[in-house]
Every structure is written in structure tokens, then in C-alpha cells.
Amino acid sequence: MALLSVSCREATPARAPETPKPELFLLTALPLVWSEDFGLDQPGSPALKALEQVYRVTAIDLPSQLPDGALLLAAQPRALPAEELVELDSWVRKGGRLLLLADPMLEWKSNIPLGDTRRPPMAFADTGLLERWGLRLDAPEERGARDGAVSERSVLTASPGALVATGDGCNVRDAGLTARCRLGKGEAIIIADADFLNVGSDKRGEQNLAVLASQLASLTR
């Protein structure tokens, strides 16, 4: 019996080591990682849960914290000081990969009073970054939900903006909802909406998160 037991243990195949997840850095003012009251007992958002299935997500406060060549999701970030905008531009041009959600009319509901710095910015604070990349972000003429598409994937947005090319570095797509920019050795995708991350667990939520996943994946190919 002892010999049989040893033989069975030796025949058990060794478990292959798990492949480590790639790292994704997250820069955002949206309540994706923490709820608005910063309660530790509050679960992460559906968007964060979806990201963590694929990536090791690391939240940062400033672009200067990024390592070279990394992947960054910047989702409606707070206004950055000028030196950090320069840092972000330089980081991309040195090989960084950026998915920027720049919403000119955020509809995400918040209980934080207007003027409180904890509240997500109602409009993307563009202080020249998009202009430097050859883009203009226009606010919508009318507010409300919009059915759209990103790279032929259905997406439900809320009061999305429109991107307009003002130079040669970016290719505007999806009826102005997105743009893809080659910048030096790096690349940036801009989506003129951030509300599409404010989802539940229904089919439309799954579709929106599939758009997020596909755009991030396209930056790693």
C-alpha cells in the first residue's frame, strides 16, 4: 500500500506556474477604485472588477509616477499641473501607451457638492495637451444617452463629446467619438466619453466593458 501511494503521488503532474498578469496603471477622478465615501467595505466598481480579471491594476496620482513603456488608463483625471502634463506628453513619446477618457460633459451622478475637489470634474480639464497632439474636443450640443460604436463594438454613452483633428498626428474615428494618435515611440487612444464606465451588470454594461477591454488590448499588440 505504501508503494502504491508513493507511485500515485509521483504520477501526479506538476501544476504549471500561473502566467503573471500585465500591469495597468490607473489615473482617475472617477469612483472606480473607491466609492465616494471612501468606505473600505464598499466593493470596487464593475469596471475595476473587469480590469482586474486581466491586469494588475495600480492606481497613481500623477504621470511622473509612471515607469517607461507602461500601459495607462487615464479616465477623466483631475486637472494636472503644467509640469505633469509635460511629463505625460514626454512619457507617451518615449514609448508609453495611453487610453485617455476625456469627457467634456460628464453625467456621472455624484453626491459630493460642486466645488469640492473630491468630486470628479464635470468636463475634461484640457490645458493644451490635446491641442499639442493635433486634436480639439468639442462639447455636445445636446445632452442625453447615445448609442454609438467603437471599432464596430456597440457602446452606450452619455452626452459624449466630439474629437476633431487639427493636425496630422491623430486619426479621428467612430464619428468623432475616438481618435488614435502615434506620438514618437508611443501611442494614445482618446475616447470623448467617460460615462460609459458607469455600468451595471446587464448586457449593456457588458458591452461597454468589452469596448474598454478591446481598446486597452489594442495598445498591447
What spans do the regions from the language model cover?
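Short, surface-exposed patches at the edges or C-terminal ends of soluble domains, predominantly
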Residues: A2-R221
